[in-house]
Amino acid sequence: RRAFDNGNIGYDELKKVEDETITELVSKLKELGYHVITDGEFRRATWYLDFMWALDGVGHKPTKTGLPFHGEDAIVDDTYLVGKLKLSGEHPFVDHFRFVKQFEDENTVAKQTIPSPAQFLAQFLFPFNLESTFAQYESEEAFIDDVVEVYNEFIRQLYDAGCRNLQLDDCTWGMFTNKSGSILFGTTKEGTVEVQKKYKGVNNRVIDAAPDDLVVTTHVCRGNYHSTYISSGPYDAVADVLLGEENVSAFFLEFDDERSGGFEPLAKVPEDKKVVLGLVTTKRPELEDK
């Protein structure tokens, strides 16, 4: 990908490498007995921004500062609004999904991952992006309405392509668990719960509008850039709103070290929802002893 970005190879060569590595990945997933297959997000520069860059109204450029992770700045493009949000034509992730779907069989289903609506909202409502966002929108409500419409249209496209398993990746809740999380969201500690409800609300508007036979789950973590993290804190601070009120079918929750706290907040998860515990870390090469 770096060679492509530097102009040393063309898109066809990049896509050939992507196709080959994704095919190899899916083969390994099947060999190991996994019933859900993905493309490993191998076609993306970042796990979340590529989705946004494909939309009308979103601009980006190389960053001069990065985002402050623990011990390292995450060097990802500055991403901001330059116009009203709209999905014109087919989103490129839909074709990415089609490539994986061809490998489905009686034992496997293809899953698509995207940043959650809350993650999208956070990107453009963080303090450093407020000026550009409200240069395009007269109110937060109008912006949120367009976010919901863009997601609804994307999900329609994805569903029509045969997707029945969608995962919303969401680091906003991990940031809410941080002691200084309120600063990131431009509020006070006392105002954090209302902000959480706003982010939960935009997620639920999109989830509730999805087709009934589309399984929608969410993955929550505290950031991962070169195995560093952006926040720390237990799920207690978000248990009521996220675990108790978000309308997903299942939660995939990071629990791979002491930064995640204990399991007590899981008591807030309704009985009709599933929880998958992320106990095995991807951040260190050492294998767990049990």
Question: Which role fits each region the language model picked out?
Answer:
Residues R1-K290:
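Domain-level signal for soluble alpha/beta catalytic cores
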